[in-house]
């Protein structure tokens, strides 16, 4: 017979949510940094053809 699981505590829920949000923050920061370096021409990982 199926037994319902115990409730996740509020503190555990907040910790998991914070970890999830922090991952998104760092990903967006890296993407912004890469876009900034591409726009200024200082990128070392991408080669962008310049249009004259």
From Swiss-Prot:
Presence of keyword Cell cycle = no
| Protein location | Plastid, Chloroplast
Q: Which UniProt keywords apply?
A: Chloroplast, Plastid, Ribonucleoprotein, Ribosomal protein
Pfam family example for this protein?
Ribosomal_L32p
The record's annotation in SUPFAM superfamilies points to: Zn-binding ribosomal proteins
Gene Ontology CC annotations of this record: chloroplast; large ribosomal subunit
Q: Could you tell me the Gene Ontology terms of the biological process aspect for this record?
A: translation
Could you give a GO molecular-function term held by this entry? structural constituent of ribosome
Describe the family membership recorded for this protein in Swiss-Prot or TrEMBL: Belongs to the bacterial ribosomal protein bL32 family.
The protein depicted here goes by the name Large ribosomal subunit protein bL32c
The opening ranks of the lineage are: Eukaryota, Viridiplantae, Streptophyta, Embryophyta, Tracheophyta
């Amino acid at each position: 017979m199926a037994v319902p699981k115990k409730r996740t505590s509020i503190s555990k829920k907040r910790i998991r949510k914070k970890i999830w949000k922090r991952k998104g923050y760092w990903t967006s920061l890296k993407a912004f940094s890469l876009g900034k370096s591409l726009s200024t021409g200082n990128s070392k990982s991408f080669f962008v053809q310049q249009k004259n």
